[in-house]
Amino acid sequence: MKLFNKEEASFETLLKRLLVVCESHSRYHGSSLDPMVKVGHEMRKISGYLRCILRKHAANHDGMSLTQSIVNSYKSLFKDAQILDLYHNLLFGCMHLLLDANMSYFRMDSQKLFAVLLFKVYYKLRDIFYVTNEVRLGSLISAFVYKFKSCYDFISCNSLKYGSVRDVISGEVSLINLPPIDSNKVINRAYYRLDVKKLAINNKLVEILELDNGEIAIFEVLSEKMPYTLQTIDNLFQSLALGNHDLMNVGRSLLFRPFRSGDLDLIRLDDSGAKLKVPINNSIVLRLTCKDPIQWQEYWKHVIRKLFDSTATKEYKRSGSKISQQVYVRSNKPDYTSPKRNDDMPISSVKISDTIHNGRTLHRSIPLPGSLSSLIETSNEYPDEESLSIMSERATVSEDSDLDTSLKDIESLSCEKLIELDKSIQVPLSPKYMDTPTLKNIRTASQTFSLESVSPELIESVASEIDDSESIISEDGKDKRDKDLFDPDIDFYKPTLYRRKSSSLLSIFSKNKKNLTIDIPKNHSRSLFSLPGNQQSVTPISASPHDDNVDETYVSFPLSINTSGGAVYFENNSVKVSLWNGKSWVPLSKDMLCLSLILSGDNETLLIIYKDFEREKCKLVVKLEPTWKYNRSTAQDVQLRIPSSDFKASVFGTLHDLTLSIRCAQAAKLVNVLQYQLQSSQTSSLSPSTTTGTLSTVSSSSCFSRNVTRSSTENSELANMKDSSEYISSSLLLSSVKVRQHVKTKADVWKPSRVGYTDIFSQEYKGIVVAIKFVICSDAEGTLYPREYNSRLHDIKRLGRTGLSFTDKKEAYLLEFKNQDVVDHVHKLILPFNTSWQSS
């Protein structure tokens, strides 16, 4: 018992010393931009953890019996999950302050006491684990060791400093200022030992970084230690616990200006390093010794020789000039067309096409830059003599050949002519054996490719090769290449209801939107729904070659559906729709179809697929129900699983549930509209009269449209006006809007009271909106106990950037919304009612 009391007293003293250090740094106040304010905030949290830990230790000590052993006492203490969480927050919170990449305050030598106390606590916990073998405590210690090692190595390898850069090339060895090196340009790095007697550098650990432009940069390792492993990280912990805070001076410091080719002269290469000198000042000699001999022999030795060996550079230039002379002789011959040179073109300047083609994709060929003979280039892998002989042979072929090798003539050649052309061209540098061309291997490439110009034989042969459901790329010369069809990074879209100029939705059936095209990119369109049987879903209509069997029948829009007084949620005039028949995707039409999501006069959300927005040319009319399943299978494909009972009209039988694939450029927008409509129809418990014409449900993760004006609000029928009513009726304006409610104290100070969601209703009397009702469900109380507040229109005012104040029964309240866009939208909904009420 005495031994436990002694150990526990020592541990509590250690924790109290750490608490004093944390509390001394928790008093920082000032601007939020001051990094020390963030330190003070973190230190206040760590101080709270330490106080809770001390209380836990004191309670465990008071509850011990006189006969209880040290092992059992610590086991009973660390069986509590709460104290393990407290120690987790303590260790990781201190580690984040110690290894913050943006602030090196606690890595300064003056603040080493913080690190010393932290690792003494760590070693105390490790000793307790060795005694008790508590599994969760061991997991906490292992997680801390792994995380600290990872963060330490990361900040050490990626913190590059440029305060002591010397220009040894100029011979003055003066300090210079250089722009930082982009870490993305580093292609390789290795550790060396550097010796420069002139600069008093002896056996210094450095790291050499190879850049993508061929330069090398020599950085000093400030900690003078190689990266730690899980086996050697304990050496770092012991050193920090003993106060060796120099190891926290992490990072890399650039010693010299990056060296380019020819900046240094190579004196000697050996099995482990190199000796280099500065051409201007021969007294500056750099001795580099690689820490990894294998890496030196396999890679770095060749890099150093290529950069600084002057003899190798001269031989390379001499061989290049010899080849250029031969090319000059050949280019002076009559009727010789010089090929377009791109030898000096950097790799980064070549523009890569956004569409990646492979051998199994049918696409439009890129026009060749020159004649066929000019496309054969000399390989650098062959000696100079063989390269020159090959070039002379090709020049002879270019002069003696009777065949015109232009691309347009090749397209019109027969099989025999192509074979003759192939035999006349000698290509000894081919990397592999090429089969003799046959009819089935011939592919023609026209300048304006289209699916209609491809022969049926070619389609049949290519279709057998396309087994990965890739779509045929349809390209139009009038299309703009610099504009994407869709935004792949879109997070959400909230549909904004709008009314057309006509008071009825009948106008959407009389639009003429022909001659519209859409590019259909390559996609793997696979159905993710549970389909009967083991059939594998293949590509949708965009890749199906069976367009000849498409049924071009239509049905009329049902007369029983009232389309007057509704709203349009979504509309697109260029969609491709396919139907899954259990084995493959069957297109609904050869042409592009139109898709509309509307709200009918009977408060039903309808999905309509038709041609040219004509009422008599409908493919299907379906009512949206919560039982639908939807999925965005690819970037431009949306798949729907529709029950048979929801069809109002269709061109096919509706005895079974159907799966549709809809391809359009606005797939992300369509998915978000469907998600909102299906969720709102599932969760809505209000009567149809109170939900007709309401705006979109706004969750805590969404925002409002920025383009809502007063006129658009008035035209969207947000409230269901009842001119003949003799009682007060409520119409839902918005639902599930995230808010924080404040109440006003006696000192006229707003005090937060609860956080939750609010539904906003308009209160109407004889068709005139006289008040606004807020129904708030807090997160703590749940939806079973909502609180209702009624406020007159003139008592609702904007307050601050995100606030809206109102008065209910002579008590003032404040609703704080998520951002300014939300409160602007809410205020614009209420503003027209307030204006009309004042005018009346």
From Swiss-Prot:
Annotated family: Belongs to the UPF0508 family.
Name by which UniProt lists this protein: UPF0508 protein SCY_2952
Source organism of the structure: Saccharomyces cerevisiae (strain YJM789)
